[in-house]
From Swiss-Prot:
InterPro entries: Met_Sox_Rdtase_MsrA_dom (IPR002569), Met_Sox_Rdtase_MsrA_sf (IPR036509), MsrA_MetSO_reductase (IPR050162). This is Peptide methionine sulfoxide reductase A2. Activated during dark in short day conditions. It catalyses: L-methionyl-[protein] + [thioredoxin]-disulfide + H2O = L-methionyl-(S)-S-oxide-[protein] + [thioredoxin]-dithiol; [thioredoxin]-disulfide + L-methionine + H2O = L-methionine (S)-S-oxide + [thioredoxin]-dithiol. Disruption phenotype: In short day conditions, reduced growth and increased oxidative stress late in the dark period. HAMAP family: MsrA. The gene is MRSA2. Catalyzes the reduction of methionine sulfoxide (MetSO) to methionine in proteins. Plays a protective role against oxidative stress by restoring activity to proteins that have been inactivated by methionine oxidation. Prevents cellular oxidative damage in long nights. MSRA family specifically reduces the MetSO S-enantiomer. GO terms for biological process: cellular response to oxidative stress; response to oxidative stress. Keywords: Cytoplasm, Oxidoreductase, Phosphoprotein. Its main location: cytoplasm. The modification Phosphoserine is found at residue 205. Pfam families: PMSR (PF01625). It is found in: Cytoplasm, Cytosol.
Amino acid sequence: MDSSLKTQEPQVVETSPSPVAQEPPQVADKPAIVPSPIAQEPDNDVPAPGNEFAEFAAGCFWGVELAFQRIPGVTVTEVGYTHGISHNPSYEDVCTNTTNHAEVVRVQYDPKECTYETLLDLFWSRHNPTTLNRQGELLGAQYRSGIYFYTPEQEKLARESLEKEQKKLEDKIVTEILPAKKFYKAEEYHQQYLVKGGMHGNAQSPAKSCKDPIRCYG
């Protein structure tokens, strides 16, 4: 038989496997902000014996806290978040501008040494109450102007002081005056931030009646 008539063996051609398309890495979504009725509860914390609470929102809480620390009769200051929709928010949560919390300073003061009116006077002097959700270049609901009262007397004095302050200004005051709701203490590094040196490591004095200018970032 002619060898040319032999059945040809099939040739096997080796091929490289087709590259598998690589999916982009999955980025975990941030947890959604979940509204909680707990955030709407009243502030039921109790001040030290002989003291009363007062609470104010006047922009970034660092400089506002130091100003209140310097008032004779103020015994304790804390910075935190309130009047938002979520329970136990972090600073990062608040900065998303989705929780509606305000940055606040909660003050304990001895009414025998310091009047609520004194605290109100400082509040008005520390910020611009006519800019909605804004203080200077700081934008967002966390920087809004607010007075959060603990007693009917505080509410009365707050509203009277607003009327008095409005007469001095051409623009309309947008300060909210509302009952104090649940207070969420801010992270420890925010507490007495400027006294500890602030952003630049330059400690500022909390001494009573100190008149040194307050540098908002340290």
